[in-house]
Amino acid sequence: MLSRMTDFWGVSFSGDDGKPKQGHEYRTLHDIFGCAEMGIILRWKDGLLHDDGDLPAVEFQDAHIEHYRNGLPHAEKHMPAIIADYGTQCEYYIDGKQVTE
């Protein structure tokens, strides 16, 4: 499994105001020593990871991307939902269910 976000699948997140997260946010992930490791962009709709048009719900600084619809990995059949290792590895999902050929 290539996803780095499995703990987020189907989980609804709220902002500091208690309302479901909306829009996008940039975060910096840190290692156990508190040093910055990598930037990540997260896109939300109604508290769930969700693509914004053609933009993936999750973009890591190292080019790892994950497409989501309503909190679950999703892309149409001809497109991978998860793209890792600079495009050399891909996984296909529809509504959170992995699709194999």
Give residue spans per PLM region:
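Glycine/tyrosine- and acidic-biased, solvent-exposed loop/turn segments at the edges of beta-strands
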Residues: M1-E101
